[in-house]
UniProtKB/Swiss-Prot annotation:
Record has rRNA-binding as a keyword: yes
Highest taxon of the lineage: Bacteria
Name by which UniProt lists this protein: Large ribosomal subunit protein uL22
Record note on quaternary structure: Part of the 50S ribosomal subunit.
Keyword NAD part of the UniProt annotation: no
GO MF terms held by the record: rRNA binding; structural constituent of ribosome
InterPro entries with a match to the protein in the record: Ribosomal_uL22, Ribosomal_uL22_bac/chlpt-type, Ribosomal_uL22_bac/org-type, Ribosomal_uL22_CS, Ribosomal_uL22_sf
Homology family: Belongs to the universal ribosomal protein uL22 family.
CC terms in the record's Gene Ontology section: cytosolic large ribosomal subunit
Amino acid sequence: MSETRAVLRGVRLSVDKGRLVADLIRGKKVDQALNILTFTQKKAAVIIKKVLESAIANAEHNDGADIDELKVKTIFVEQGTTLKRFTARAKGRGNRISKPTCHVYVTVGN
C-alpha cells in the first residue's frame, strides 16, 4: 500500500517542543499513537494529534486503507519562520521577542 501524508505549516510552536512529542509516536500503530497523544499533557500533543487524524482520514478516504493496519511511518517537525516582535523597555529602549513557528509532517502506511 502507498503511504499517505498530512502536513500542517506555520504552527505557533517551537521545534524542540514539537519534536519532543513526535518522538513518542514514531513507528507506533495508529491507535496506540492516538492513545499516547490523548494522554500527553503538552500543547504539541493536541496539534500533532490533529495532523495524525488528518493523515488517517486521508488514507481511509483517498487510498481505502484499513485503519487497524496503519502505522506512523514518518513524523518530523521542521523549523518555520520566526515572527519577530518588540516589547517596550525602560528609557525608550526595546527588546526583541522571537515567536517561533514550525511545520509538522506525518506519513502513515502499512
